[in-house]
Amino acid sequence: MSEKYWNIASHYFAGGVNSPVRAAVKPYPFYVERAEGAYLYTADNKQLIDYVLGYGPLILGHANQYVTKKIIEQVNKGWLYGTPSPIEIELARKISHHLPSAQKIRFVNSGTEATMLALRLARAYTGREKIIKFHGNYHGAHDYLLLDAGSAFTEFNVNVYNGIPKSIVNTIRICEYNDAECVEKLSKSEDIAGVIVEPVMGNMGVILPDKDFLERLREITLTYNSVLIFDEVITGFRLGLGGAQGTFNVTPDLTTLGKIIGGGLPIGAVAGKKEIIDMLTPAGKVFNAGTFNANPLTMTAGLATIEVLERENVHEVANRAVNVILEELVNALDKKIPNNFVINHIGSMFQVFFGVKKVSNATEAKLANKEMYQKFHNLLLQRGVFIPPSQFETIFTSYAHKDVVVNTTLEILRKVVQEL
C-alpha cells in the first residue's frame, strides 16, 4: 500500500512529501495509519517501534490517554475562537514557572515562526541588524536562518541560497558551534543584534556544548549588549522541565520553543525578558499576529503534556531507555567495529556516528560515514525499529519506551550490529 500511496502522492506533492526528510526513507516512505504508545502501524500492516516520535514532540509517546482525553474534551467545546481563552493563560503560567528565561511569552504556530519573531525582537531591541548563528544549527525554514543550517541541507545537498536575497544573507554571520572566540571576535568588530544557538544541536545529529561554551556566549552577549537567543524547540521540556537552560544553568534573553509544548499539535513560542517581549503589539511597536496563535486545541494538548511531565516520572523513564540501549549498543559496536564510531547523547536524545571518533561541531559530523548509518537504519527498519532516516537527525525515546519495548529493541540491535 505504501508504494501505491507514494505513486499517488508524487502527483500532488513536490518530491511526494510535505517535508523533505520524510522522503529519505528509500525506495519510498512508508505510510502510517495509526500510532499508539511507542508503536507506529503502517499501511503495509507492519508494527514499528518508533524512535523518531514526530521528530521530538511526543515525549509521552503516541496518543497518550490523558492528552487524548483532554483534546477530545476541548474539541467538544470548540477548537478556534478568535478571542483569548483561559487555557492559554494556564499553559503560559506552566512554561513561565519552569523555564528560567520565561518572564513573558508570545505563542505562535511553529518553531520557524518563533525564531523569525525572536530575530525581529532582537533587532528592534538593539537597533542593529546582524545576527550570529552557528554552522549546522537549524532554526526553521525561513530566509534569515537557513544559511549553513542542519539536517535538510546536509542530507539533500541543497543550495541554501536559492530564493534568498543577498541583502538578507549579508545580515547573517556564521561561527562553528563550540567556537566562542569567533563570536567574541565578530561582536568586537561588527554591530551584532543577537546570537542564536541550539544549546544542544539536534539537527546535525546530537552535538553537545563544550564545557563553558554556553556560559561564554552569555558573557559575550552581556559585554556587547546583544541578545542571546536559545533555540529550545527540541530541548525545551525534553532535557527536563527547565530545558537546556535549566540543565546547563545559563539563562538567555529570549528562548524559542515548539514541539513538546504543543503536545504534538502545531505550536511555537517566544519567551523571555519582560522588556523585550513587551515590545510586541499591542503593548509595543514590534508587530506579530496570527489567526491560530494560542488556539485552544493546541493549548490544551500542551498543558496536558506538561501536567503529565510534572506528576509522573517521564524524564526518568525516557532517559533510562537511552542509557540501557546505549550500554548494549556500545558493547556490540565495540566488538564489531572497535574505535570506529562515536555516540553522542544527553537525556532522551542520542545519535550514532560511524567512521569517526569525535563529533563536537557540524564540520566533524559531516565526516561521519553516512552510508553505514543508512545501512544501520535500513536493517533496523526491516526488523521493526524506526530511527531517523537521516544521519543528521536525533533518535528520541519517550515515556512509552518502557522495559518491554526496550528489551525488544535490544534483541533487534544485537542482530543488526552483526550485519553491519
Curated annotation (Swiss-Prot):
Modified sites of kind N6-(pyridoxal phosphate)lysine: K259
GO biological process: protoporphyrinogen IX biosynthetic process
CDD domains named in the record: OAT_like
Chief site of localization: cytoplasm
Localization of this protein: Cytoplasm
InterPro entries in the record: 4pyrrol_synth_GluAld_NH2Trfase, Aminotrans_3, Aminotrans_3_PPA_site, PyrdxlP-dep_Trfase, PyrdxlP-dep_Trfase_major, PyrdxlP-dep_Trfase_small
UniProt key word Cytoplasm: yes
UniProtKB keywords: Cytoplasm, Isomerase, Porphyrin biosynthesis, Pyridoxal phosphate
Protein's pathway: Porphyrin-containing compound metabolism; protoporphyrin-IX biosynthesis; 5-aminolevulinate from L-glutamyl-tRNA(Glu): step 2/2
Major enzyme class: isomerase
GO MF annotations, alphabetized: glutamate-1-semialdehyde 2,1-aminomutase activity; pyridoxal phosphate binding; transaminase activity
One Pfam match: Aminotran_3
Reactions catalysed according to its record: (S)-4-amino-5-oxopentanoate = 5-aminolevulinate
SUPFAM superfamilies listed in its UniProt record: PLP-dependent transferases (SSF53383)
Family of this protein: Belongs to the class-III pyridoxal-phosphate-dependent aminotransferase family. HemL subfamily.
The name this protein goes by in its record: Glutamate-1-semialdehyde 2,1-aminomutase
Naturally occurring in which organism (per UniProt): Sulfolobus acidocaldarius (strain ATCC 33909 / DSM 639 / JCM 8929 / NBRC 15157 / NCIMB 11770)
Gene of this entry: hemL
